[in-house]
Design a protein with these regions (language model features):
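Glycine- and charge-enriched loop/helix tracts that form the active or gating conduit
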Residues: 1-155, 159-177, 181-201, 209, ...
């Protein structure tokens, strides 16, 4: 948005980009709806840039993303996958998930995660609360050098808890078999997003056996 004039060593900023940078604010140039209509992948990119840079989207930009979120499905699965891989990289993976949800895009690209937002867990084991809170907490703990598949293992390891939730007579919450059902769900999600067979196998097997890892000594 800025034009640098070498002769006078000055920057001509006709769209207020310098001010937005100083205030850590994300804004499209011109009408947000028009910019997103030019390439619907920009809807996801707006979320990724906000997460990566720790910026806030200005109201009109965020409103346009929310209004147009459904159009992201017009973008190829491969392009969506590549953008999500960048979004869920540490150290901004947890904020990326939150912004994806708040923007309405989570419901479009990873709708299977939506039920985790309200899925309660036993406070004895999960004082952090819902399955969604558990997932975002784990994402926030990922090391920056984590392999690209690891955030996806975290995202999907408890994906089946909402559909397997039961409550005992004593009031305890259980999720019997969620790891096996979750592995099947994870495979379908990753295939839909056109992950490679090698990536799918690694993530799915980790989801399938993650309850055994907690007992390892």
């Amino acid at each position: 948005s800025d034009v640098y004039k070498r002769q006078t060593d000055t920057v001509h900023d006709w769209v207020g980009g310098q001010k937005d940078l100083a205030q850590r604010r994300l804004r499209t140039i011109g009408n947000p709806a028009q910019r997103f209509a030019e390439d619907h992948l920009r809807l996801l990119r707006a979320v990724r840039f906000a997460a990566q840079l720790d910026f806030e989207s200005e109201p009109a930009t965020l409103a346009a993303v929310r209004e147009m979120a459904g159009r992201i499905t017009r973008v190829s699965a491969e392009r969506i996958r590549d953008e999500l891989l960048k979004l869920f990289r540490p150290p901004h993976a947890a904020r990326g998930l939150d912004l994806l949800h708040e923007s309405g895009l989570l419901a479009q690209v990873l709708p299977e995660l939506l039920p985790t937002v309200t899925c309660d867990q036993s406070p004895d084991y999960h004082p952090e609360g819902t399955v969604y809170n558990h997932i975002r907490l784990m994402l926030s703990q990922l090391p920056t050098e984590a392999a690209a598949a690891l955030p996806w293992t975290v995202l999907l390891h408890d994906i089946a808890k909402p559909v397997t939730q039961s409550v005992s007579k004593e009031g305890r919450i259980h999720f019997y078999g969620h790891e096996k059902i979750g592995a099947d769900m994870a495979q379908k999600i990753l295939q839909r997003l056109r992950f490679t067979n090698v990536e799918i196998e690694a993530i799915v097997q980790t989801v399938r056996y993650h309850m055994q890892f907690k007992d390892a000594t």
